[in-house]
Every structure is written in structure tokens, then in C-alpha cells.
């Protein structure tokens, strides 16, 4: 921890530490691979985790992993210097996923899905080959609430980015220690620390992405009610299945069984769902 931490640094340490404790993200002896993309979020994550590691008495390890995807203009010289100055173990691995993405995705379409899929595969493989049991990602509170809104509006389901999950190959735990942290605090901290940010030219060149639209919508709502983002985050921790419509989580069809009555009720269906099916139509 800095000898004289700023107010925003104290805030980041508090909320990151709280998230780690709330979800039991890191345990004694863990080898945590921090995915350092070169953006403000991952720089903040690595810096704060390193301070918490020191505070814990080195009860866990951290390692910075950066994937150079061979994008034009990529320059990691400042990143290498920064990592060396911080004495943080690291590796910058070069894999040309850029050419694959450019070849497969038509001009004007978003590259994010394929790009992240390729990146995820490389990250999992590297973690497995090098004995890291935890993979830390830099998604923050606003990423979580934007993803929730996107899922509802564009996919028709309720999901977001979990704070902790088991990887698809069942070999790693993926954690998001910044899940309580506001993006504005990360921006302030990144400015204070003068991180050597490496911009993502691949994504930044594309306008009108869904995520930007949703972020703008949430920002507009927050002007009238500043609690909107935090309320959305709280909603992810306060599901009420009986107030929703998912029959996998609530037995709506047989609620009559729970009635407190002396009368005998016959729970025989008058209609069945098949009678009202329409082909290829969604309500």
C-alpha cells in the first residue's frame, strides 16, 4: 500500500478487498494470473491486487499475463518498463489473433465476440500450462450492470458477469475483484498513477456498438437518479423467483398445492401449452 494513499486509492482497496472476502475469491496459496490488457481497468486491478498481496503477508501469488494479439500499432515498451519497475512477475505472449479476426469478421461488424473467444482460449491454456489456479479479470461494476441491461434488451435473458466462476474446462476459477468498483474511480486512479495505457485500436475504431448505447442509456437514467447503477448491481444479488416468470425456479403451475384451505381442489389442467403453440414466434 502506498505510504500516503489518495482517497480514491483507499476506496479501491476497500471495495476490492470486500469483493474478495464476500465471494471468497482468493485463498491462501493461490497462484493468481492477472490478465493485463494494457487498459486502465487491468492496470488498476494489478496494482490493487499487488497491494493487497503485500498487506496479506504474501499469502498468495500474482503474475501479470499480457497477450499481444499482433494488432497494428501495438507497442508494449512502456508496459515492459512499468512491470520491471514494479518487480511484478510477468510475461507478454505474442499470438496473431488479429489476422484471424480481420479475416472472419466483415468490415463494420463488431470484432469483440470472436476476439474475446480466441483470447479466452489462449488465457486458459497458458494458465493451465503454468500452474495458475485463479484467473483475475478487470471487469468493474459498470461492466456488470451494462452487461445485465444488454442481456435483457438484446438477448431476452437475465445474466451478467459473475464475480466468480468455474471455467468451461473446469480447471480454473475466474474472478472479478473489481466487481464493486465504479469506473469513474478507476479513471481517477489511472490518471493519478499515470499508467502507460495501450489503446485497443481494434475495438475503439467501431462506433455505435451496443455496449456504448446501453452505457449512454444508464448514464442518462443516473442523471435523474444517481442510484440507478448501484440499484442494478444490487438486483443481481437480490433475485425473487416468485416475482419473475421462470418456471425452472418457481413452480407456478402447482401453486394451488400451497393453498391453506379445507376444500379439496382438483389441480387438473384446462389447457396445455401445446394447444397454443405458434411456429417461430416469440411473445
From Swiss-Prot:
GO terms for molecular function: 4 iron, 4 sulfur cluster binding; ATP binding; magnesium ion binding; sulfurtransferase activity; tRNA binding. One of its GO terms (biological process) is tRNA thio-modification. SUPFAM superfamilies: Adenine nucleotide alpha hydrolases-like. One of its GO terms (cellular component) is cytoplasm. Pathway: tRNA modification. The gene is ttcA. Its cofactor is Mg(2+); [4Fe-4S] cluster. Keywords: 4Fe-4S, ATP-binding, Cytoplasm, Iron, Iron-sulfur, Magnesium, Metal-binding, Nucleotide-binding, RNA-binding, Transferase, tRNA processing, tRNA-binding. Belongs to the TtcA family. This is tRNA-cytidine(32) 2-sulfurtransferase. It holds the Pfam family ATP_bind_3. HAMAP family: TtcA. [4Fe-4S] cluster binds at residues 112, 115, 203. It comes from Legionella pneumophila subsp. pneumophila (strain Philadelphia 1 / ATCC 33152 / DSM 7513). InterPro entries: Rossmann-like_a/b/a_fold (IPR014729), TilS/TtcA_N (IPR011063), tRNA_Cyd_32_2_STrfase (IPR012089), tRNA_thiolation_TtcA_Ctu1 (IPR035107). Its EC number is 2.8.1.-. Binds 1 [4Fe-4S] cluster per subunit. The cluster is chelated by three Cys residues, the fourth Fe has a free coordination site that may bind a sulfur atom transferred from the persulfide of IscS. The thiolation reaction likely consists of two steps: a first activation step by ATP to form an adenylated intermediate of the target base of tRNA, and a second nucleophilic substitution step of the sulfur (S) atom supplied by the hydrosulfide attached to the Fe-S cluster. Signal peptide: none annotated. It catalyses: cytidine(32) in tRNA + S-sulfanyl-L-cysteinyl-[cysteine desulfurase] + AH2 + ATP = 2-thiocytidine(32) in tRNA + L-cysteinyl-[cysteine desulfurase] + A + AMP + diphosphate + H(+). It is found in: Cytoplasm. It comes from the Bacteria. Coiled coil: none annotated.
